[in-house]
Amino acid sequence: MTNIKILPPNSVNDPIMKLMSSKTKTRVLFKAPLLTQSGYGVHARQVAKWLLQFRSSNPDSIEVKFDPTSWGSTPWYVTATEDEPVIQQIYSNTIKAAGEPFDISIQLLLPNEWTTDRAAVNIGMTAGVEADTCNPLWIQACNKMTMVIVPSEFTKKMFFDTAKKFNMEITVPMVVVPESYYVSGQDIWAEASVDKKLEAVDTSTNFLIVGQMTGDSFLNDRKNIGYTLRW
C-alpha cells in the first residue's frame, strides 16, 4: 500500500508501546465510522491506513481489527474505490464476534459513544463540536478513557473551558494530533486546482460552503446546508 504516515506526538505512543513491549502480540481494535462517506469516515480511514502500515512493518507484534459503525444517515462504501482502496482491507479485518477481548481500543466517535469494556487501554478520538462549550457529560466520558486525542487546539480548549465552566476537571492526557498525513515522495498540494477555480469567479461577493448534505430534508440536515442556500 502507499506509504502513508500520520505524525502523532510521542505521548500518543507511550501507553501503546508500553503495553506492546510486555506482550508477544498486541491485539488492537479500531472502532469508527470507517466505511461511511463522511468527514469522520475520511479521518477514520486515515487512521486505518496508519494502523495497517504499522502492522505490515510489525507483523509479529500487532494484530489489527476493525469495528465499523454508522454515522447518522450517511451512506456506506460497499466496495473498494480508486480513492479509497483501503475499504477492502477494512472489510477483510472486521471483527466477527462482538465480545472479542482486545489489549487496546481506539475509538473515533463522539465521547458519549466511547466504551471501556473491550480493552485494557482505551483511547478516545473526537473532533468535539464547532462551539466553545460541550455537554458536561462529555467531560465525564473523557475521564473514563486512558487518553483522548483531538484534532485541534480549538477542540482541546473547548473541552478544558467546559470543564472549568462546570467546576469539573479533565484527569486524563489530552493531546492534539492534526487530521493530516502525507504520502512519501509526493507533494499533496501539487495537483490542487481550487485556486484556479476561485480565480475564475467573477462576482464581487461570494460564499464558500464546505460540507455534505446529511439529511433527507432541511430540518434534519445537521450541516444546515439547505437553509444556508435558501437564506
Where are these regions (language model features)?
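Nucleotide donor/acceptor-binding cores
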Residues: K25-T26, A120, T205
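Donor nucleotide-sugar binding/catalytic pocket of nucleotide-sugar-dependent glycosyltransferases
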Residues: T146-K157, F166-S193
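Extended catalytic core of nucleotide-activated donor transferases of GT-like folds
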Residues: I4-M20, L29-K31, S73-F160
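Short, flexible/disordered intra-domain loops and linkers
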Residues: T36, W76-D83, T214-I225
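Short hydrophobic "strand-cap" motifs at the C-terminus of beta-strands
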Residues: K31-A32, M125-T126, P151, V177, ...
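Conserved catalytic-core segment of nucleotide-activated headgroup transferases in glycan assembly
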Residues: V42-W50, V183-W231
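Short beta-strand segments
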Residues: L29-A32, K65-P68, I106-L109, P178, ...
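N-terminal subdomain of nucleotide-sugar transferases
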Residues: T2-G72
